[in-house]
């Protein structure tokens, strides 16, 4: 009986993957460990008045869910470590 209980405890820990936190970029070269409950990395891009000369503005980060899409804003969401790199730094 003790062996069965120990096996169940070990299986529960393995299945729950306790302590895992997602890692996301917050700038082109810096990443952070996301807070508990933040299971998505995102990359937002949009044009401002200088888009033609400077390119799109970018925002990186962690979120609980993929941010809402608004007109003129592109959003990419993903759920693996460092999956939201700067578009020019992608492999």
Curated annotation (Swiss-Prot):
Compartments reported by the entry: Secreted
GO MF entries: acetylcholine receptor inhibitor activity; ion channel regulator activity; toxin activity
Cysteines joined through disulfide linkages: 24-41, 34-62, 47-51, 66-77, 78-83
First-listed, main subcellular location of the protein, grouped into a coarse class: secreted
GO cellular component: extracellular region
The organism's place on the tree of life at top rank: Eukaryota
Keyword Heme applies: no
Matching Pfam families: Toxin_cobra-type (PF21947)
InterPro entries tied to this protein: Snake_3FTx (IPR003571), Snake_toxin-like_sf (IPR045860), Snake_toxin_con_site (IPR018354), Toxin_cobra-type (IPR054131)
Signal peptide limits: 1-21
Homology family: Belongs to the three-finger toxin family. Long-chain subfamily. Type II alpha-neurotoxin sub-subfamily.
Name this protein carries in UniProt: Long neurotoxin OH-37
Protein species of origin: Ophiophagus hannah (King cobra)
